[in-house]
Amino acid sequence: MRIGWTASLACLAILVLSDLALDESVAVLAGLFCLAPLIACSVLPTASTAAVMGLALAAAIASGFWNHDLNEPQQTVRIMGVLVIGSAAVAIAEVRVRRERRFAEMAQIAEAAQRAILPVLPHHAGGIDISARYESAVEGALVGGDLYDCYHTRDVTRLLIGDVRGKGIGGVEQAARVIRAFRQAAARQTTLADVASDMDEYLVPFFDDEEFVTALLVESIAPDRLDLVSAGHPPALMLRRGDGLAPIEIPNGLPLGTGLVAGFTETAVLWEPGDRLLLYTDGLSEARDETGEFLDLAQLKAPLAEPHALDGVLDVVRRHVRGGSLGDDLALVLLEHPAA
């Protein structure tokens, strides 16, 4: 707003000073004083634009005194021109302000809708510390085709991370559908493999031939064991306490929603207090710098050992793609076995 005031008043001041400097016989700049409210209407609110118009109109009238032509028809036309164009500028400012307000309200509604689609994960469930982050590849969007969710009861904790093939509104819609499928399946199926099969069956009618979702499912029943099922998803990364960072290699089934899967394989993974398991989508593994080089996931070992691990991971990704781009949405879920 300060820039708008500065530009408008500077324009008016230059025109007034020029009008004063010109010989009275050629002083015809008063009609141009309307430029000030025209500048104001593009950035200032309605009341401020009206104030600038008032100053421009007062300056145009004053111009008639110092040029001694206030009663001349030409000066009257100039003053009326400033009044008419200034009034139009005020009307333009009002239309602009209303439109900006409407856009802001729509943006708030869209933000609330996007946040409703992507669940807020609990910080602690089933003896596991949980944190999550999401980065959309679409500027201005909060969510896209990547997703995560957590289903927790007294007896079992189940987590999902997935990546829908697709972007934009279509990807968001399908991501919401996948989350719904997960919640239904997680609530009624007894094994993690059956959860994946149930989700696959549910999604088939909603996905066309080119649509699918990769997913990694994690289940915690016993304190020192995790069960994993992969449906075409990148492998989780395990950071062992006092050891290195390594992917968890498990059988990788077909993505969900294809209807081509006969069954899924569960794999049990032991973990100990202090261990951390990173679930991620391919926005992490496929992050490229300006030369097209992929991010080396080994660089994540140091930040994953820190207290605010996911913030550190995102910093590594941002530094890597600087000058390049985050070509896909990125979802991260970190599971930690609390230290005894």
Residue spans for each PLM region:
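Subset of alpha-helical transmembrane segments and adjacent helix-loop junctions
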Residues: 3-8, 15-33, 51-52, 71-77
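Hydrophobic, membrane-inserted alpha-helices
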Residues: 10-16, 33-38, 56-61
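Transmembrane alpha-helices and immediately adjacent membrane-cytoplasm interface residues
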Residues: 40, 44, 48-51, 55-103
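DG-centered beta-turn motif at the end of beta-strands
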Residues: 45, 163, 233, 280-283, ...
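Regulatory cytosolic signal-relay segments
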Residues: 82-145
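PP2C/PPM family metal-dependent serine/threonine protein phosphatase catalytic domain
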Residues: 128-141, 200-203, 234-268, 293-294, ...
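Active-site-proximal, acidic helix/loop segment immediately C-terminal to a metal-coordinating Asp/Glu
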Residues: 168-185, 251-252, 265, 271-325, ...
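Catalytic core of PPM/PP2C metal-dependent serine/threonine phosphatase domains
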Residues: 170-249, 264, 335
